[in-house]
Amino acid sequence: MWSESRIEALTPTLAPTPTPHYERTMTGFLKVEKLAKAYQADKPVFADVSFDIAKGEFVCIIGHSGCGKTTILNVLAGLDTASSGNAFMDGREIAGPSLSRGVVFQGHALMPWLTVRQNIAFAVQSRWPDMRRADLNAHVEKFVALVGLSHAIDKKPSQLSGGMKQRVGIARAFSIQPKMLLLDEPFGALDALTRGTIQDELMSIVGQTRQTVFMITHDVDEAILLADRILLMSNGVEVDGHYKPGGIAETVINTLPRSRTRAQLHHLDGYYDLRNYIVDFLVSRATAH
């Protein structure tokens, strides 16, 4: 099947695993060790969550609402703390927010009184307070252009559509050149056409920058399109009077060619096998066992 733990069971009809576009390491650029979070001592939302992400790797996490995906992302962002366990990035333990990690949430979180240029410049100046004005403007304009918003650079958020606001958020996150990008369902509130367009832009930027990305999504096709690996997360469940916390149940390797596009995705050999495997997990196996 598709999980790393069951890779030996791959059938001959499935697409062969291509050479990854990143170099995998034993330690990982990001390392999560036995992470757990409990709001009630006897019922942790998740427990024993461990995974690595290699530098330049794009990893998506999928699971039902309430399983703890956003909590994990918030711990990685330094916005929340785990009940137990540790998370390390580039050899250092994560302890609080840092400009080395860019975060994009489902809501755009732009300052409404500032223009697109000023919103992004504010972030850039936080990272490089001594940057000259000319260099600052050039830097901001570069990342605004990457998301196709040069024509709207001097507009305020109230003058932008929802999709344009999300593009600004993505440009702002990339503009501080973080070591890692954390995305919490960044396209979840957008219509299908806008979502597809921004997915294309994200793939292009990630390809240019070789950015390391950890992304939450509920969209199976989105995960297959974007990710090198997909973490499948289970919900906690009561079994025979005992509570079993959720966690990372399976890790799926995306064997489709890295050069895939939205238009060709469903034509690729192995696409439906991969999609059906993930959907089957969500329907039949997404509880702790």
Model-derived segments and spans:
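Short coil-to-helix segment of the ABC ATPase nucleotide-binding domain corresponding to the Q-loop/switch region
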Residues: 114-123
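Conserved signature/switch motifs of ABC ATPase nucleotide-binding domains
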Residues: 155-158, 176
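The feature captures the beta-strand-to-loop junction immediately N-terminal to the Walker
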Residues: 62-64
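Conserved ABC ATPase "signature" region
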Residues: 132-152, 204
